[in-house]
């Protein structure tokens, strides 16, 4: 049970991000800025709490507004410019991470900041985002429950609502969707906002778990979430994907990452695994796409 707890905890953070990433990918777009948004969100919460003397709930709300504004700007820039979202959000990644590091150094002289556990509202936020649920005598992080709720909500949205139909149609053919009256631009902007929300959610979990922030804590999370989505069957070209498949992809990553640690293998081998899985997933994805298009 202890081993299951460890890999599910890792999988839950990947999985929450991957739900947002997968929905956006199904709509035919990418967001490479979510990793930097985790660092941005966590540092903004901590700075507002420790340096600005805000309560953690209020600081978290302010951070949420800032984070979804970045997501909105990403989406608006993509739909208005017509440029690939890969390029737009790659630029956003560097802008957000650079600003987060620069502002953190200007205010505190550091890129890591703690002391949030003594702040007002910490116990309340911690109980919501980083407490434990006891099952069969084993304490499981509440983030696992949040992950399950995200999966259920994503599955219902994608498979049982008109919005889900719009997402599939937008990814399959933007032009045809617009001719059918589907609000393609609004769908895409909304999904960019949702991926930003997912990044903020992970940031709150991390801040309340570790009692502080590190500007680099979300580094490479964007790639892990994308790979988890692709492993789960989401097409890189859009128009097809499964939230349950994405959940399995996140579980695979969690098991491998913890397996490497438990085996006493150098953690750098996880980078090798990521690369192998990315190439393999792309190859399988290409084969699956041909069957999907011609089948």
Annotate the PLM regions.
Residues 172-175, 179-186, 256, 260-295:
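Cytosolic-side transmembrane-helix boundaries in multi-pass membrane proteins
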Residues 7, 36-40, 57-65, 87-90, ...:
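Hydrophobic alpha-helical transmembrane segments
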Residues 1-52, 77-82, 230-244, 276:
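Single transmembrane alpha-helix segments in multi-pass membrane proteins
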Residues 199, 209-275:
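Transmembrane alpha-helical segments in multi-pass inner-membrane proteins
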Residues 85-161, 187-190, 210-218, 293-295:
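Transmembrane helix-bundle core of multi-pass membrane transporters
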Residues 1-6, 100-103, 107, 157-164, ...:
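Inter-helical junctions in multi-pass inner-membrane proteins, predominant
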Residues 55, 59-63, 69-74, 78, ...:
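Helix-loop-helix "hairpin" substructures at the membrane interface of multi-pass membrane proteins
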Residues 20-21, 97-100, 146-157, 192-203, ...:
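Hydrophobic core segments of alpha-helical transmembrane domains in multi-pass membrane transport
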